[in-house]
């Protein structure tokens, strides 16, 4: 069965059209109308090997927050939908990714219990403007929105970093690498990887 999802979400603040394939090769077509976010979501697709198409627009004349948040919500929902009953997945994964002076570690559990813990960001990171429109605080908000709507437990730890762009990119790439292995089918797993029999 194909592990794919296609979700369209429309509100008074944004229009999101997102399609993904968990068993892809990392092909992406991203246009969120927020250039730095395009860069991050392209990296997420590329390094997770999830084929990802996003066409999004919204009230960015007010702020990019609504479009960024709603895109993350839909990505999380699509991830949950594509995972289906979660039979055969590896479930747990972690990845540590550097980008020059920055280093980020992501740990993922596709548990069905949404949780997100972010730690280690340097002081003032949340106030930094990255790429002209994207604040450091939005990185955490994106991670939380993905985790809550995908039903996954995510721990993101910034281990080192000075440049806000590098820190954010290391975080997105670490999440990508962790997702790549967590969603992968393990041929040795029979059924759902939980002693409860359900996730």
From Swiss-Prot:
Reaction(s) catalysed (UniProt annotation): D-erythro-1-(imidazol-4-yl)glycerol 3-phosphate = 3-(imidazol-4-yl)-2-oxopropyl phosphate + H2O
One annotated GO biological process: L-histidine biosynthetic process
Record's keyword terms, sorted: Amino-acid biosynthesis, Cytoplasm, Histidine biosynthesis, Lyase
PROSITE patterns tied to this protein: IGP_DEHYDRATASE_1 (PS00954), IGP_DEHYDRATASE_2 (PS00955)
EC code(s) of this entry: 4.2.1.19
GO terms for MF: imidazoleglycerol-phosphate dehydratase activity
Pfam families tied to this protein: IGPD
CDD domains referenced in this protein's UniProt entry, alphabetically: IGPD
Subcellular location: Cytoplasm
Domain of life: Bacteria
Pathway: Amino-acid biosynthesis; L-histidine biosynthesis; L-histidine from 5-phospho-alpha-D-ribose 1-diphosphate: step 6/9
Entry keyword Amino-acid biosynthesis: yes
Entry GO CC: cytoplasm
Protein's name according to its UniProt entry: Imidazoleglycerol-phosphate dehydratase
Species, as recorded: Bifidobacterium longum (strain DJO10A)
